[in-house]
Amino acid sequence: MARIYVASSWRNQYFPEVVTRLREAGHEVYDFRNPPHGGAGFHWTDIDPAAPGWTFDQYREGLHHPLAERQFAADLDALRWADTCVLVLPCGRSAHTEAGWMAGAGKRVIVYIPEMQEPELMYKLFDGVAGTLDELIATL
């Protein structure tokens, strides 16, 4: 069985079912929404409610806030722990960065596309794409 880092978005409606189905299939799964160290994951607004409107300098400073440092370390530990990344679309910058890190580390990356997005050629950098949960689980 695989140790899986599921990379996605807080707003992704498919994420909870993906985590559940992967666990039911016997895989170990890192769930950033419910991290093993407790808490409810990381939100920039936990540092500052005005974070969405920050200047670049405020953002750069925020990267060194203890909450940001703690969550970054937890996510990086999880990336190192995992042998596989499942990138669940639709998602944004962080999830794509995480998937790219995993691929660069020589780890398997599968893109799960439950609803067709604009075609992306560079997903060929990864190990495969899956259009259904059954296909995803069979691929793993």
Regions found by a protein language model. Name each.
Residues 1-140:
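Conserved catalytic or regulatory cores that recognize and/or transform ribose-phosphate-containing ligands
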